[in-house]
Amino acid sequence: MTHVVLIDNHDSFVYNLVDAFAVAGYKCTVFRNTVPVETILAANPDLICLSPGPGYPADAGNMMALIERTLGQIPLLGICLGYQALIEYHGGKVEPCGPVHGTTDNMILTDAGVQSPVFAGLATDVEPDHPEIPGRKVPIGRYHSLGCVVAPDGIESLGTCSSEIGDVIMAARTTDGKAIGLQFHPESVLSPTGPVILSRCVEQLLAN
């Protein structure tokens, strides 16, 4: 059974993620972000999920140190704050983008997002008369006030949403395919296809 270690960044969504991983058939172990990196590695995770949470990534316990130790070695899935940590680790800028809390919005897939197996068949704007033309709108649940507009080196944007500072990246992956980040919340009921997206992220990461 795939063992997912979930890093708890003190967020109310953490146990929604635990439930989502359990429903998908994964074993899930939770560690607070203050737990030493060596303790986390000793749990022998197949994949590490960096959870949502408040504030900025640099203030989230040992999360940045964990990324330093594991990126490229153990598959990483970052959600909301966890995604922002991956952005900052690669030198990207995470900044206030206007609060968006508890709303379903349409993420617009980039060309890379259209081609990604994570979002295959999930777009809602495919025209019945032209099914050969891929859709780009995927409904997702947004709960955030920070975001990134420009993907740093090593990060490829998969989808964006509009914000006060421009189109913020809502889904991304590292160019080596070893990490995926989601600014939105796949574990939220506001993400209609969230469970599918979450499972596909795990599948893609484990396949690389």
From Swiss-Prot:
Keyword Lipoprotein: no
All copies of domain Glutamine amidotransferase type-1, residue ranges: 3-208
Species the sequence originates in: Corynebacterium glutamicum (strain ATCC 13032 / DSM 20300 / JCM 1318 / BCRC 11384 / CCUG 27702 / LMG 3730 / NBRC 12168 / NCIMB 10025 / NRRL B-2784 / 534)
Name of the featured protein: Anthranilate synthase component 2
Superkingdom of source: Bacteria
PANTHER family attached to this UniProt entry: BIFUNCTIONAL PROTEIN TRPGD (PTHR43418:SF2), MULTIFUNCTIONAL TRYPTOPHAN BIOSYNTHESIS PROTEIN-RELATED (PTHR43418)
Residues reported to bind L-glutamine: G53, P54, G55, Q84, S145, L146
Assembly behavior: Heterotetramer consisting of two non-identical subunits: a beta subunit (TrpG) and a large alpha subunit (TrpE).
UniProt KW keywords: Amino-acid biosynthesis, Aromatic amino acid biosynthesis, Glutamine amidotransferase, Lyase, Tryptophan biosynthesis
EC number(s) reported in the record: 4.1.3.27
Catalytic residues, chain numbering: C80, H185, E187
InterPro entries according to UniProt: Anth_synth/Amidotransfase, Class_I_gatase-like, GATASE, TrpG/PapA_dom
Metabolic or biological pathway, per its Swiss-Prot or TrEMBL entry: Amino-acid biosynthesis; L-tryptophan biosynthesis; L-tryptophan from chorismate: step 1/5
Reaction catalyzed: chorismate + L-glutamine = anthranilate + pyruvate + L-glutamate + H(+)
Molecular function GO terms recorded: anthranilate phosphoribosyltransferase activity; anthranilate synthase activity
Gene Ontology cellular-component annotations: cytosol
Main function: Part of a heterotetrameric complex that catalyzes the two-step biosynthesis of anthranilate, an intermediate in the biosynthesis of L-tryptophan. In the first step, the glutamine-binding beta subunit (TrpG) of anthranilate synthase (AS) provides the glutamine amidotransferase activity which generates ammonia as a substrate that, along with chorismate, is used in the second step, catalyzed by the large alpha subunit of AS (TrpE) to produce anthranilate. In the absence of TrpG, TrpE can synthesize anthranilate directly from chorismate and high concentrations of ammonia.
GO terms, biological process: L-tryptophan biosynthetic process; phenazine biosynthetic process
Keyword Glycoprotein (UniProt): no
